[in-house]
């Protein structure tokens, strides 16, 4: 009887966990850390590695701004108004609340293109620094 109860409990946990929609995130997210800056502000640092990635899901950042630094490879952004490729040791800035990602005009990068990115954002403590849009 004990094994039956344990088995049913395990199955119900698996069913419950499988019933939830997967949360949207950035492709290739390797790590994310937050640092308390004081005065109600936090710095969020993300590291991402991906290949053959021509875009991201539609989103915006209600942060003071976002700096994206290319550690290696090639990435692209439309933050300047036009699509631009960025390579190792280059970076771009994304203004607060700029809706981007999921654009129909996102250019395809050559097959096998990889990028390693370091993303830094400063946002109000306890608030979401990235909002994905359906």
Residue ranges and their predicted role:
Residues 3-12:
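Sec-dependent N-terminal signal peptides
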Residues 38-39, 61-62, 69, 84-85, ...:
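Extracellular/periplasmic catalytic domains that process cell-envelope and extracellular macromolecules
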Residues 97-128:
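Ligand-binding loop in jelly-roll beta-barrel domains
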Residues 6, 16-44, 85, 92-95, ...:
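A short, N-terminal "cap"/entry segment at the start of jelly-roll beta-barrel domains
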Residues 63-81:
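Glycine- and acidic-residue-biased ligand/ion/polar-headgroup-sensing regions
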């Amino acid at each position: 009887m004990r094994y039956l109860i344990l088995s049913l409990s395990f199955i119900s946990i698996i069913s419950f966990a499988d019933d939830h929609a997967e949360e949207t995130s950035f492709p290739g997210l390797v790590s994310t850390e937050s640092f308390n800056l004081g005065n109600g502000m936090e710095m969020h640092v993300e590291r991402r590695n991906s290949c053959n990635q021509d875009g991201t899901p539609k989103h915006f950042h209600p942060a003071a701004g976002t700096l994206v630094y290319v550690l290696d490879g090639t990435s692209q952004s439309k933050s300047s108004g036009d699509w631009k490729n960025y390579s190792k040791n280059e970076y771009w800035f994304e203004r607060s609340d700029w809706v981007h990602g999921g654009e129909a005009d996102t250019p395809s990068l050559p097959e096998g293109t990889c990028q390693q990115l370091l993303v830094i954002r400063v946002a109000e403590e306890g608030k979401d620094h990235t909002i994905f849009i359906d």
